[in-house]
Regions:
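Glycine-rich phosphate/adenosyl-contacting loop at the front of the ribokinase-like
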Residues: 1-71
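Ribokinase/PfkB-type carbohydrate-kinase core domain
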Residues: 1-4, 67-81, 85, 92-181
């Protein structure tokens, strides 16, 4: 599912529109529910086989994601690269209270589609998909299931996987009800 890099910035205060805010610290980290769940499980040494499935760009953010998967020994054979879009990323502004605001560029995640999930390793038992509303190809309509993501989840259940789903918080997105409910 969703794979991205968060470029996280600590700011002195949230600026008024058109004004400058000082960044006091910056770092990057992985983002996206499926990627972060995989890396957390790997760090916990839970003993489960872990496999990433996603689409990233041919860029430094994509290189960073692959390096993190390698560092924690997560199978990345199903992570594909594309030259048609950059790796998805967010600029995350964190104010002194810890409140975060995300400026997001969907990038390659928009292109991730059903064929990426064909013939997954049968040793895997849990399938986690995220984030709906940021996976444009999987959010497309499907005559039988409503959306392509619903088709994917049904296929995974039919193959014996326990499935889970994560949604992104997008205030006022008119697609929420038809895609999620």
């Amino acid at each position: 599912g969703n794979m991205l890099v968060d470029h996280v910035h600590q700011i002195v205060q949230w600026p008024e529109r058109g004004w400058l805010a000082e960044i006091t610290h910056s770092e990057r980290s992985t983002g996206g529910a499926p990627l972060n769940v995989l890396l957390t499980l790997a760090k916990m040494h839970v003993g489960l086989p872990l496999q990433a499935v996603g689409l990233i760009g041919e860029d430094s953010d994509g290189d960073y994601i692959l390096a993190m998967l390698d560092q924690y020994h997560v199978n990345r054979q199903r992570v594909q690269r594309t030259t048609f879009a950059p790796t998805s990323m967010s600029q995350v502004m964190t104010d002194p209270s810890g409140q975060r605001t995300f400026f997001h560029s969907p990038g390659a995640n928009r292109l991730l589609d059903l064929p990426a999930f064909d013939r997954l390793d049968g040793a895997m038992k849990i399938f986690h998909l995220g984030y709906l509303l940021l996976l444009d190809s999987l959010d497309m309509p499907d005559d039988e299931y409503g959306t392509r993501s619903a088709r994917l989840l049904a296929q995974m259940r039919d193959q014996g996987y326990e499935t889970s789903l994560d949604l992104v918080s997008r205030k006022g997105d008119p697609r929420y009800q038809p895609l999620v409910l």
